[in-house]
Design a protein with these regions (language model features):
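Active-site lining segments that contact anionic ligands and/or coordinate catalytic metals
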Residues: 185-187, 206
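Alpha/propeptide regions of enzymes that mature by internal proteolysis
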Residues: 17-183, 190, 212-248, 254, ...
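Conserved alpha-helical positions within TPR/SEL1-like repeat arrays
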Residues: 268-272
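Sec-dependent N-terminal signal peptides
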Residues: 3-13
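Nucleic-acid 5′ end/cap handling module spanning
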Residues: 205-212
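Soluble secreted/lumenal catalytic domains
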Residues: 202-203, 232
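Core structural elements
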Residues: 188-196
Length: 283
């Protein structure tokens, strides 16, 4: 019955709002700031193909935006531009909402580098739809199986340990454990940008992962985060090899292997480091 009502609501919104060019990204997401590092991030899962192409927007030293429901992608780049010019997340979101004739079907959250957070869930977003704003984060969801999803995400984020990726991942997993998207699951994404911007995007990107189409996108995202960390250590190992710091390189290659034991190549580089250091017997 709920699904039938949801379908009727979906159709009525599409007709009455005349927004056929928009896409209904029914999903759950989090925008967050790591107060210690200044890193900004967005994480999201949806039963929609390639959600990472539309929902998450982050700029180092500026802010982060998640735009979903009947998504208007402009909220992402336009929100970041306003925050970069000095506008708070609250004022930036209000400015864009005030100009949007279809704000009733939008769900948007913004956070700026100073920790100001704001979120909007339009009154015609498909139920269950809600958001929770907390200290340095906002979680939001629409078309959920249960109304408890945002609260569960907030609790998980606040009570989890680790870095920003760990905490945002905990929020996504909590949402799924509460029932998640009423339609199922298909894609996920996580983007984290540096708290110390250089102005060079690839240098400022701490993590950028997209699961485009997968039966268990959160499990795959978590796996790729682990592999990402492995290669972060491998890259540090390469750096130390360039500096002829063999012991430091070995430490990093070993950590890489611990994160990604399925990959036989990573121990190989430990052996290479030992040989280059004249420690052939240990290799």
């Amino acid at each position: 019955m709920r699904l039938f009502i949801t379908c009727l609501l979906f159709c009525s919104i599409s007709i009455s709002q005349n927004i056929s060019d928009q896409r209904p990204i029914s999903t759950y997401s989090i925008v967050a700031l790591d107060e210690e590092t200044g890193e900004l991030g967005v994480a999201v899962q949806s039963n929609w193909f390639s959600v990472g192409f539309l929902v998450p927007w982050v700029k180092a030293g500026v802010g982060a935006v998640a735009t979903q429901s009947f998504v208007k992608v402009d909220y992402g780049p336009d929100g970041l531009k306003l925050m970069e010019r000095g506008m708070s997340a609250t004022n930036a979101l209000k400015s864009l909402i005030d100009k949007d004739e279809a704000e009733a079907v939008r769900q948007v959250a913004m956070i700026d580098i100073n920790g100001n957070v704001s979120a909007h869930t339009g009154e015609r977003c498909i139920v269950f739809a809600n958001h929770v704003v907390g200290n340095n984060y906002s979680v939001q969801a629409n078309m959920m199986e249960n109304s408890t999803v945002p609260k569960a995400m907030a609790i998980a984020f606040e009570n989890s340990t680790g870095d920003l990726a760990d905490k945002m991942m905990a929020a996504l997993e909590a949402a799924e454990n509460e029932g998640g998207d009423i339609r199922g699951k298909q894609s996920a994404a996580m983007v984290i940008m540096s708290g110390k911007p250089t102005g060079v995007e690839w240098k400022d990107t701490k993590l950028s992962l997209r699961i485009e189409d997968h039966p268990t996108p959160l499990k795959e995202l978590k796996r790729l985060i682990r592999i990402h960390r492995a290669y972060q250590h491998a890259n540090k190992g390469d750096y130390y090899m360039e500096k002829d710091q063999i012991d430091n390189a070995l430490i990093e290659y070993t950590k890489a292997s611990e994160y990604y034991p399925e990959n036989p190549e990573l121990p190989y580089w430990s052996a290479v480091a030992l040989v280059n250091g004249g420690r052939v017997n240990e290799a």
